[in-house]
């Protein structure tokens, strides 16, 4: 039973502070996000060495630094993407972007950070058909297609800027530990999906195994254990011992039968309309021959 509250009596809450959902701009309407940050798509597209940086935690900052060193980017547009499953420090991505600017110095301009999101796209890829996917492929985790979503949500922005590269910070191994969302086959599938849109997905640290190498990229100024946005689904695929064990054949079938074709369907639909019926697109993939 809820305690009775008399008229005029203020309600109390045990939470430290009221939760406010993070604000974002619809990923499908990239020019709006740019305008809200005081940026102009045409002038940015004219810059020859521009890249979009995926911003999350330390690995994403390390990836951005590595990409600048390897490809010579002189302008980075930091972006974060809302998933609806996050909790914690809402300012963490923006703070990471600021630290990135300090790391790179005056030779690289780090633009104001953008926050994007597409709840309907996330729901279609991860939520609506979760039981169907689990039964069909014998593997299921919201993390699998969430990483595809994180990349896809930046595609309209990239295209608005002339198809500039997107830099991501995924790693195939984290000190010998695997993350189901960052398996080699899945990363390759995401690269191919974005390539269909004419966008290069760069993964400069995907084969960086050791934390010491990441630390060398981000420098001593990075605070160890600094607050970051967390996900309610974190490590949902891990066993009681914390290890990631999965059926590699089932995973390969999932990538071939769902992950890549679903991503491709979204990319192709965007050629015709900015906000397609994502649920219908994913349903069609699951009803198609490749998902059998």
Residue ranges of model-derived segments:
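Nucleotide-activated chemistry modules centered on ATP-dependent adenylation/adenylyltransferase
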Residues: 2-6, 10-292
């Amino acid at each position: 039973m809820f305690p009775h509250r008399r008229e005029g009596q203020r309600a109390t809450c045990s939470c430290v502070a009221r939760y406010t959902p993070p604000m974002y701009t619809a990923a499908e309407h990239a020019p709006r996000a740019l305008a809200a940050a005081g940026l102009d798509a045409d002038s940015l597209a004219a810059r020859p060495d521009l890249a979009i940086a995926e911003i999350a935690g330390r690995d994403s900052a390390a990836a951005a630094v590595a990409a600048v060193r390897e490809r010579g980017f002189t302008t980075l547009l930091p972006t974060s993407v809302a998933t609806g499953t996050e909790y914690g420090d809402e300012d963490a991505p923006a703070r990471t972007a600021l630290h990135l600017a300090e790391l790179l110095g005056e030779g690289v301009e780090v633009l104001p950070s953008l926050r994007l999101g597409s709840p309907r796209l996330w729901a279609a890829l991860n939520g609506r058909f979760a039981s169907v996917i689990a039964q069909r492929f014998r593997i299921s985790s919201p993390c699998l297609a969430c990483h595809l979503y994180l990349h896809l949500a930046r595609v309209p922005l990239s295209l608005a800027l002339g198809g500039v590269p997107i830099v991501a910070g995924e790693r195939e191994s984290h000190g010998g530990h695997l993350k189901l969302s960052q398996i080699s086959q899945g990363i390759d599938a995401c690269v191919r999906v974005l390539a269909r849109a004419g966008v290069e997905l760069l993964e400069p640290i995907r084969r960086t195994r050791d934390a010491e190498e990441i630390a060398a990229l981000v420098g001593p100024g990075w605070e160890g254990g600094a607050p970051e946005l967390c996900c309610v689904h974190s490590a949902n695929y891990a066993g009681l011992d914390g290890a990631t064990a999965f059926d590699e054949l089932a995973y390969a079938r999932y990538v071939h039968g769902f992950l890549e074709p679903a991503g491709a369907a979204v990319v192709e639909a965007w050629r015709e309309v900015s906000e397609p019926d994502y649920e219908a697109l994913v349903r069609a993939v699951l009803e198609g021959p490749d998902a059998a």
